[in-house]
């Protein structure tokens, strides 16, 4: 149990630092859409899709790696709370079109990245 807790802790910290770095780098590039949050969510969605595909086929993988990558790293990297706050800020500024675009791209983009990664990894390990 302690190993699992440490894996979540290490993965979560690493994912959170990665999200912060992405926000610092990409959020200033566009005033209306926080590109750092979008990038973090899309990357996290891809990684978790790849992870689930990999873990479903490689059943002998240590559970520590599973929680390090999924619950830890992806949990720290992706963020629904920041996304929600940014949507509210856009609404408060009256940027309704940008709000809808931001919600659409974050949600559908994340679903698409998870499905793409799962499909790519499943196809590559089917042989």
Swiss-Prot record:
Na(+) is not transported, but it plays an essential structural role and its presence is essential for fluoride channel function. One of its GO terms (biological process) is cellular detoxification of fluoride. Keywords: Cell inner membrane, Cell membrane, Ion channel, Ion transport, Membrane, Metal-binding, Sodium, Transmembrane, Transmembrane helix, Transport. GO terms for cellular component: plasma membrane. Na(+) binds at residues 75, 78. It is a multi-pass membrane protein. NCBIfam families: crcB, PRK14196.1. Belongs to the fluoride channel Fluc/FEX (TC 1.A.43) family. This is Fluoride-specific ion channel FluC. It comes from Escherichia coli O7:K1 (strain IAI39 / ExPEC). The lineage of its organism: Bacteria, Pseudomonadati, Pseudomonadota, Gammaproteobacteria, Enterobacterales.
